[in-house]
Amino acid sequence: MAKKIVGFIKLQIPAGKANPSPPVGPALGQRGLNIMEFCKAFNAQTQGMEPGLPVPVVITAYADKSFTFVMKTPPATVLIKKAAKVDKGSSKPHTDKVGKITRAQAEEIAKTKMPDLTAADLDAAVRTIAGSARSMGITVEGV
């Protein structure tokens, strides 16, 4: 028989930097999960990633105090800001442009995000990434 699920916990944790302090500790502690076990497993799985890159994770908590977790790809906005070499998007996105990325950079981001996007093919994924970039005040060349 399958384990009884008692809840899902969604967090964004920097790669390789999970520790028992907030937000991780309180979120897992409320469900009675082993915080250090999660931190060690998460840090081990994110070892190959760029340190500090925020990684969305969905933790499934079971009635017997065990858990499983699924990591998603980093948010598109973080990848776009990194490619454009800017710290934050524009406060007036359609008026003030804060940076630019090329189509090749948008394709690279789309390939990274492809498992989490609903796009049917790479071209549709590139258009999705380009739309996100435009809404941040970042120009996409060649799209």
Swiss-Prot record:
Gene Ontology terms for molecular function: large ribosomal subunit rRNA binding; structural constituent of ribosome
GO CC, one annotated term: cytosolic large ribosomal subunit
Keyword Mitochondrion carried by entry: no
PROSITE patterns, per database record: RIBOSOMAL_L11
Entry-linked SMART domains: RL11 (SM00649)
One example of a Gene Ontology biological process annotation: translation
Record-linked InterPro entries: Ribosomal_uL11, Ribosomal_uL11_bac-typ, Ribosomal_uL11_C, Ribosomal_uL11_C_sf, Ribosomal_uL11_CS, Ribosomal_uL11_N, Ribosomal_uL11_N_sf
Pfam families xref list: Ribosomal_L11, Ribosomal_L11_N
Coiled coil regions, renumbered to chain: none
PTM section of the record: One or more lysine residues are methylated.
The keyword Nucleus belongs to this UniProt entry's keyword annotation: no
Keywords: Methylation, Ribonucleoprotein, Ribosomal protein, RNA-binding, rRNA-binding
Function description: Forms part of the ribosomal stalk which helps the ribosome interact with GTP-bound translation factors.
Quaternary structure (record): Part of the ribosomal stalk of the 50S ribosomal subunit. Interacts with L10 and the large rRNA to form the base of the stalk. L10 forms an elongated spine to which L12 dimers bind in a sequential fashion forming a multimeric L10(L12)X complex.
Family the entry assigns: Belongs to the universal ribosomal protein uL11 family.
Name the record gives this protein: Large ribosomal subunit protein uL11
Gene source species: Burkholderia mallei (strain ATCC 23344)
Taxonomic classification: Bacteria, Pseudomonadati, Pseudomonadota, Betaproteobacteria, Burkholderiales
